[in-house]
């Protein structure tokens, strides 16, 4: 810069000296241990006690389910799906 005031060419020259190209490619390699894998949801054992839809006897089921899975099962058993005990199943088979 020559003189007391900066001129446009002086400013542009200074900016070009500050700007440096940046390599945006990442050449880092991850080991197999570091690669992210989706963890399978944890399955927890649940005991379900529900009545037979015909005679009312208690039926016991043990299931392995995720939190979302057991909620879905609960909705089904309280709604559209009903359980039948072995004795009532035999009666249904013969009718």
From Swiss-Prot:
InterPro entries: Papilloma_E7. A motif (Nuclear export signal) lies at residues 70-78. Plays a role in viral genome replication by driving entry of quiescent cells into the cell cycle. Stimulation of progression from G1 to S phase allows the virus to efficiently use the cellular DNA replicating machinery to achieve viral genome replication. E7 protein has both transforming and trans-activating activities. Induces the disassembly of the E2F1 transcription factor from RB1, with subsequent transcriptional activation of E2F1-regulated S-phase genes. Interferes with host histone deacetylation mediated by HDAC1 and HDAC2, leading to transcription activation. This is Protein E7. GO terms for cellular component: host cell cytoplasm; host cell nucleus. The E7 terminal domain is an intrinsically disordered domain, whose flexibility and conformational transitions confer target adaptability to the oncoprotein. It allows adaptation to a variety of protein targets and exposes the PEST degradation sequence that regulates its turnover in the cell. Keywords: Activator, DNA-binding, Early protein, G1/S host cell cycle checkpoint dysregulation by virus, Host cytoplasm, Host nucleus, Host-virus interaction, Inhibition of host innate immune response by virus, Inhibition of host interferon signaling pathway by virus, Interferon antiviral system evasion, Metal-binding, Modulation of host cell cycle by virus, Oncogene, Transcription, Transcription regulation, Viral immunoevasion, Zinc, Zinc-finger. Highly phosphorylated. The gene is E7. A motif (LXCXE motif) lies at residues 24-28.
């Amino acid at each position: 810069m020559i003189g007391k005031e900066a001129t446009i060419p002086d400013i542009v020259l200074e900016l070009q000296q500050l700007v440096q190209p940046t390599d945006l490619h990442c050449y880092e390699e991850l080991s197999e241990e570091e690669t992210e894998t989706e963890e399978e949801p944890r399955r927890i054992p649940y005991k379900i006690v529900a009545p037979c839809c015909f005679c009312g006897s208690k039926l016991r089921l043990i299931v392995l389910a995720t939190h979302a899975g057991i909620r879905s099962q609960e909705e089904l058993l309280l709604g559209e799906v009903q359980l039948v005990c072995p004795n009532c199943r035999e009666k249904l088979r013969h009718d």
